[in-house]
């Protein structure tokens, strides 16, 4: 009664061998011993070929089938079922191992494909020869891969000595950077680096007035200093130092600009309000304060024997307005007439660099309010500008 459940199992093993099973008869010792010698399968790693993964899965699968047979096989039915289990388990585990390695290979191939189809990369090339043009730069970098775009930066004087090369593949761009960085081309050591995006700031123009004015009174005082020097207009003297200049804005809107309160220099021939404001009106609204300033400064004022040296001793406007006075005001006698002083002022009327303005047609006595944009631009591009870089 004690061993009756196990008796069919023990008698069933020889019968199973007689059916053609090739597996050896297992003993209780064989049931326990193989577990201590079975190595644990290594974890899956990317890039391991199929031959490394399949043999381990086969050995482990076969041993697993034997132990499943001895441990859980108690009847003939279980024995028959387990007799077919090693092959099925071997096949299933082999297919799983093959699928796993195939998945790993496909994963590595997909990663390589994605790497080869990466985003374009832009290189910054500096210190290139000035005679280089886009085809020259494309020929120099074209040996490393497909180039999408080549651009050399120019200004009005020619090449600035640097440019950009955009590769379709970032790997080609890195290889070109490693090979060409530091090489000498026509005596110049070129530098190839990864291009970085420039941070662009949007500068918005501030419009301080609701009627569309873009030139503030402070800037207007720079371009038309005669208008803002003081409350010096003959028509506004009766109003005191807090006078205002009425200027017609857009749409017929009158705008009053308060004048800067400065003390009047006695005896100085300030321009009248009618002529100066008439020349200033309209041109100021169109941003042409420079032309009005040139029209006002072209008229040499009358000579003053005791001219006070307190007005506009600045290096820029002082040289244009009053540069001539310093040359002759001390040399003239106290009884000098207005005609001789005006002639001396016209002869010495220069900007301090030896260039006389009398020969310039834009500095004539004609009103300058009707000049076009081209003429205004020519004033800035003239030979007398001290701020021209070259």
Swiss-Prot record:
GO molecular function: DNA-binding transcription factor binding; mRNA binding; RNA binding; transcription corepressor activity
Major site of localization recorded for this protein: nucleus
GO biological process, one term: estrogen receptor signaling pathway
Annotated site, Interaction with RNA, chain positions: 122, 130-131, 155, 160, 164, 188, 198
Pfam families per record: Fox-1_C, RRM_1
InterPro entries, sorted: Fox-1_C_dom, FOX1_RRM, Nucleotide-bd_a/b_plait_sf, RBD_domain_sf, RBFOX1-3, RBFOX1-like, RRM_dom
Keyword Zinc in annotation: no
Highest taxon above the source species: Eukaryota
UniProt keyword list: Cytoplasm, Methylation, mRNA processing, mRNA splicing, Nucleus, Phosphoprotein, RNA-binding
Residue positions, PTM Asymmetric dimethylarginine: 297, 329, 381, 386
Domain RRM: 121-197
Annotated segments matching region Disordered: 1-127
Residues bearing PTM Omega-N-methylarginine: 281, 381, 386
Subunit structure and binding partners: Interacts with ER-alpha N-terminal activation domain. Interacts with RBPMS; the interaction allows cooperative assembly of stable cell-specific alternative splicing regulatory complexes.
Name the record gives this protein: RNA binding protein fox-1 homolog 2
Species in which this protein is naturally found: Homo sapiens (Human)
Name of the encoding gene: RBFOX2
